Amino acid sequence: MKRENIKTILLTVLVVISLVFTWGIWTFQPNFSEGSSSTESTVRVKHKIEKTTQKLSETVRPRDMFIHDDGAHYKVDDNALYEEIWSDLPHWDVKGIKDISDQYDKAGFKSWFYGIGGSEAKLDLQFSDTIPIDIFQTLFKWSNQSFEYSSFDHILIPFNETKANKKIYLVSYSKQLILEVTVESANYRNIMNDLKNRQSNMPAFSLFSIGSKKEFLLPNKPLTMDKKEFVTESIKTNTFKQALFSDPSIVREDSNYNNRNVLTDGISRLDVNLSQRQVQFQQRNLVQSTSYQTGELIKKSQKYLEDTGSWTDHYQFFNINDSQQLSFYIFMDQIPVINSTAKPFGATSAITVQWANDDILSYKRPNYSLGTNPIKTSETELMGGSEVKMLLSKQTAYDTDKIDQIFLAYQLVSTSTNDDPLVELEPVWAMKVNGKIVPITKDLLRKEGANSGVE
């Protein structure tokens, strides 16, 4: 065989071998065993504080429900009935929207709202803050219609709707803004009949004038409610670390603090204050966003609380302040839980959230959960409307003309030392005044200035 032929054959073999090796390199896929470090470095299971999930319709809901019937007012105090009403509303089909605010002057609006002077009786769903229209659009079966961006703090549902298409109303009481919404509901008649049949057993309320400008719905007689005692369960710092940091493996603890666990990854900072029972997670070098509408902030916060598993108790959206800080309060028996000003249980009883565009700027919350089962209950009597009015007229800590809301609440009362997990939930009247939530108790008579309260 000639030398040239031998060279050609060898060259061909080398080319084939090279192609085989190249193909092997390009198609090779490593088979890491389960639990290997390589797999863990590329895919991290997202941890949550609590596995419980919560829909937007469970986070944004009315604080109170009242029936207004020819000048009489009744509070819907049956939790099962409340749930029946609120869970059915998302199934109502919205057929049309119309602004009818111009139909009423100031006196006519009040008569229409409260069912006075021949106006039809209505069910009133009251929210603790104004809710943007795009949130209602998300909650209900609502087609994409053009509308002016507005917010509402009431849904009114008339009792005497007999047509197939019913009328309900989104109302901003302070602005006297009324949006008439035409809906179709298969269960409307059953719900409204059930309410009407139970109305006589509901506690009766009246409008009480407090200060020189406003009226508030308060009970005609003292109310009997349950005082409850709970053993709180502390949530471990490591649980917050795993849920809140994007990469917990690079987080380091700062040991220069007493009775506090402070952790950072260089960008974010987690501060767990054990004596104050408070957790704060902050992002550094970010500026608070002021460009978002309230509806967007509620949706972003809902997603963040869902993604981090923040539903350690049943939290509901409560309000948003002028700094665009959103507050979510624990609700027990559909009643908000606030902190006592005289004997507070830690520094906060709410989750607060602030945003810097698409990044969380600040997340603050309690480091414990209450649970749902009290270890002890006992009956207690709550002031009637006349007593509430008299107490507020005697106190000098707050200007009664600055009161925005008065509502039922549970206040968290510390029963002993800072380390004791026992806490008492005491029924109390509360007011929103000067942007703060303040319990209405006889402690007000001993205050000289309006420096206490929960923002």
UniProtKB/Swiss-Prot annotation:
Q: Which residues lie on this side of the membrane: Extracellular?
A: 29-455
What's its membrane topology?
A: Single-pass membrane protein
Can you quote the domain comment? Answer: The transmembrane region is required for the regulation of WalK activity.
Q: Give the CDD domains listed for this entry.
A: YycH_N_like
Q: What does altering W26A do?
A: Slight induction of WalK-dependent genes
Under InterPro entries, the record lists: YycH, YycH/YycI_2
> What do the Gene Ontology cellular component annotations say?
plasma membrane
Question: Where in the cell is the protein located?
Answer: Cell membrane
Principal localization reads membrane
GO MF annotations, alphabetized: metal ion binding
Give TM segment ranges: 8-28
Q: How does it assemble?
A: Homodimer. Interacts with WalK and YycI.
Instruction: List the Pfam families hit by this protein, alphabetically.
Output: YycH
Functionally, this protein is described as follows: Together with YycI, regulates the activity of the two-component system WalR/WalK.
> Any ranges marked Cytoplasmic in the topology annotation, and which?
1-7
Task: State the taxonomy lineage.
Answer: Bacteria, Bacillati, Bacillota, Bacilli, Bacillales
Effect of disrupting the coding gene? No cellular levels increase of either WalK or WalR. Induction of WalR-dependent gene expression. Cell wall defect.
| Protein name as catalogued | Two-component system WalR/WalK regulatory protein YycH
Which residues make up the binding site for Ca(2+)? Answer: D69, D70, G115, G117, S119
Name the UniProt key words of this record, in alphabetical order: Calcium, Cell membrane, Membrane, Metal-binding, Transmembrane, Transmembrane helix
